[in-house]
A protein has these predicted regions:
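Solvent-exposed loop/turn and edge beta-strand elements of beta-rich ligand-binding domains
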Residues: 1-275
Length: 275
């Protein structure tokens, strides 16, 4: 006779009254996988917790390329699956809950966690995704023909493209890191814009408080101004002891730059003509 069940075990009874009964207690076991929501491939680098109804963490681990096995959970009790750290390039997923039936299998009727065909619980993460649009600053229309780069904190170009009439989508950027948006080639008739920066929050959205790039409806905007035509007179003088010298055998060239480092030229190179 068994008067009570051991917590975290499944009890099975075999035999008969004539020969006797055998009660076998088997510890409960459930597998949990951390996967990409798109292709269901295992993801390493997440920190996962299993939390009981009283808020106690009964199991936690860092995900690897294989499913994690949790044993000794109580049938009939509701547990919470929580991700506290997402893999790089992914967003934190929301909490889900699950319950085991008396036979140790997952109760699909009381479980919000995704369950695979083999009964494994899936903690699904989405890749970070951000849209970048190249637009005219005056009317917000998309501009094609610009070359845009996204640069990480170490100066590495993690994505680059030539703008089209549609926004560009960049995936798997790290949350909480500062990225630089840089335009290296402007569309014909437009001026190069200055660098801006942006940061993604843990849920994958743009962190407005830490972002200098203009953002509209979650889309980062690289805004260009139309180049305007103007002329400027440049005079080159050579003097010696207060006297102007003629230097007809020398040619000097001038150009205008938009930055003090003189890396962003905004005019043609012109030769000075002596008059």
């Amino acid at each position: 006779e068994e008067t009570g069940k051991a917590a975290g075990y499944i009890s099975t009874v075999t035999g008969n009254a004539e020969e006797g009964f055998i009660i076998t207690n088997t510890i409960t076991s459930v597998k949990i996988s951390k996967v990409d929501i798109t292709d269901q491939k295992e993801l390493a680098g997440a920190h996962i917790q299993v939390i009981d109804k009283d808020g106690n963490v009964v199991e936690e681990w860092d995900s690897t390329w294989e499913a994690h096995e949790v044993t000794g959970l109580k049938p009939g009790e509701t547990y919470t699956l929580r991700e506290t750290v997402a893999p790089e390039g992914y967003t934190l997923t929301s909490d889900t809950t699950f319950t085991l039936k008396e036979d140790g299998t997952v109760n699909k009727d009381t479980t919000t966690t995704t369950i695979s065909d083999n009964g494994t619980l899936l903690v699904e993460d989405s890749r970070t995704s951000v849209k970048v649009s190249k637009v005219d600053i005056s009317d917000g229309k998309e501009l094609e023909g610009a070359h845009i780069q996204i640069i990480d904190q170490d100066g590495n170009v993690v994505d680059e493209w030539d703008s089209t009439k549609e926004a560009h989508i960049t995936e798997k950027l790290k949350t909480g890191k500062i990225y630089t948006l840089r335009e290296t080639v402007a569309p014909d008739g437009y001026l190069l814009t200055s660098d801006t920066t942006f940061v993604l929050k843990e849920d994958g959205t743009v962190d407005a408080e830490k972002t200098t790039a203009v953002s509209k409806d979650g889309v980062l905007l690289v805004q260009d101004k139309l180049a305007t035509t103007a002329s400027i007179a440049v005079t080159k003088k050579l003097t010696y002891i207060g006297e102007n010298l003629a230097a007809r055998d020398q040619t000097f060239y001038v150009a205008l730059y938009s930055d003090k480092e003189c890396t962003q030229r905004v005019s043609d190179v012109k030769a000075l003509v002596f008059k």
